[in-house]
A protein has these predicted regions:
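Conserved structural motif at the start of ABC-family nucleotide-binding domains
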Residues: 4, 19-20
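The feature captures the beta-strand-to-loop junction immediately N-terminal to the Walker
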Residues: 35-37
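Helix-to-loop junction immediately C-terminal to a conserved catalytic motif
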Residues: 50
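Conserved ABC transporter NBD signature motif
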Residues: 58-66, 75
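Conserved ABC ATPase "signature" region
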Residues: 99, 114-132
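Conserved ABC ATPase signature
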Residues: 110-112, 136-140, 144
Length: 156
């Protein structure tokens, strides 16, 4: 868990500002809701919090440290973003998809370590997917597919 804070955060695409001058403090362990109409910038804002998009202006802090100065591995251990629409047309097994959550921790040739495999197995168990781990995502129900994407975020 971590404290997450923004100060005058402005985020967008190219020169188009989508979210402007947002200051928010999310204390450790606090659950918040982000609501608004379609196209209002909710996903864009979350992408900035997860360091997927860089701020146009302002700052994002994780535990009082500027997010841009923190190593990717450390950010990934504290923040994961699960998209509202995840592509399940890929021909991968559940275990393979969950293993992508370990990407920020891989070095060199990108081989998984014993610690990675442990995190993957834990995430599969936590989402009740262990018995389905070697099945193709195509064979799952909608709810099971959602659990796969949640497991990937947990493995991260």
């Amino acid at each position: 868990m971590a404290n997450l804070r923004t100060v005058d955060l402005t985020v967008g695409y190219q020169k188009q500002k989508i979210v402007q001058k947002i200051t928010i403090d999310i204390p450790e362990g606090k659950i918040i809701g982000l609501i608004g109409p379609n196209g209002s910038g909710k996903s864009t804002f979350l992408k900035a919090l997860a360091r997927i998009l860089l701020p146009m202006e302002g700052e994002v802090y994780l535990n009082e440290q500027n997010l841009q100065t923190i190593k990717t591995k450390e950010v990934a251990s504290q923040i994961a973003l699960l998209s509202q629409v995840s592509d399940s047309s890929i021909g991968l097994t559940i275990r393979e998809i969950v293993s992508y959550g370990r990407f920020p921790y891989q070095k060199g040739l990108g081989r998984l370590t014993a610690k990675d495999y442990q995190a993957i197995e834990w995430a599969l168990a936590a989402t009740d997917l262990t018995e389905l781990a070697d099945a193709s995502i195509h064979t799952l129900s909608g709810g099971q597919k959602q659990r796969v994407w949640i497991a990937m975020a947990l493995a991260q």
